[in-house]
């Protein structure tokens, strides 16, 4: 679900950027200067990548999406354990050893008669 939303956001931004470039209004020199100063605040490796690739490549987009989809899978196991602990807490008991039968003495077990 998270990766689908990320993909939709990246797709929407890339389409807006593509159509925005075609419909862009002429700007004054002052506006252009402030845009460049905003770019100088970015880290150098990101700037290098931005200037090296003028267009968005499909391979780069797929790499970013695959890296983003790896993150939620790593956290799914602890979440499952937390839910298990929650439901066990609702039941009021928890076995420290799984599937260990308790010693049951038949004399202490109530009987409702003999089934025929």
Swiss-Prot record:
Sites bearing Methionine amide, chain numbering: 91
Signal peptide range in chain numbering: 1-20
PROSITE patterns: TACHYKININ
Region of interest (Disordered), residue spans: 92-116
One Pfam family, short name: Neurokinin_B
Source domain of life: Eukaryota
Keywords from the UniProt entry: Amidation, Cleavage on pair of basic residues, Neuropeptide, Secreted, Signal
This protein's GO CC annotations: extracellular region
UniProt propeptide residues: 21-79, 95-116
Main localization, broad class: secreted
Protein location: Secreted
GO BP, sorted A to Z: neuropeptide signaling pathway; positive regulation of blood pressure; tachykinin receptor signaling pathway
Functional summary from the UniProt entry: Tachykinins are active peptides which excite neurons, evoke behavioral responses, are potent vasodilators and secretagogues, and contract (directly or indirectly) many smooth muscles. Is a critical central regulator of gonadal function.
Family label: Belongs to the tachykinin family.
PANTHER family, per the entry: TACHYKININ-3
Protein name: Tachykinin-3
Gene: Tac3
């Amino acid at each position: 679900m998270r990766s689908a939303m990320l993909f939709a956001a990246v797709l929407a931004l890339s389409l807006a950027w593509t159509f925005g470039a075609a419909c862009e209004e002429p700007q004054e020199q002052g506006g252009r200067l402030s845009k460049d100063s905003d770019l100088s605040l970015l880290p150098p490796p990101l700037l290098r990548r931005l200037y090296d690739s003028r267009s968005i490549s499909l391979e780069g987009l797929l790499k970013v999406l695959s890296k983003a989809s790896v993150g939620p899978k790593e956290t799914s196991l602890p979440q499952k354990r937390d839910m298990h602990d929650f439901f066990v807490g609702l039941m009021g008991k928890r076995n420290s050893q799984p599937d260990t039968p308790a010693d049951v003495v038949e004399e202490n077990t109530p009987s409702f008669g003999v089934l025929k």
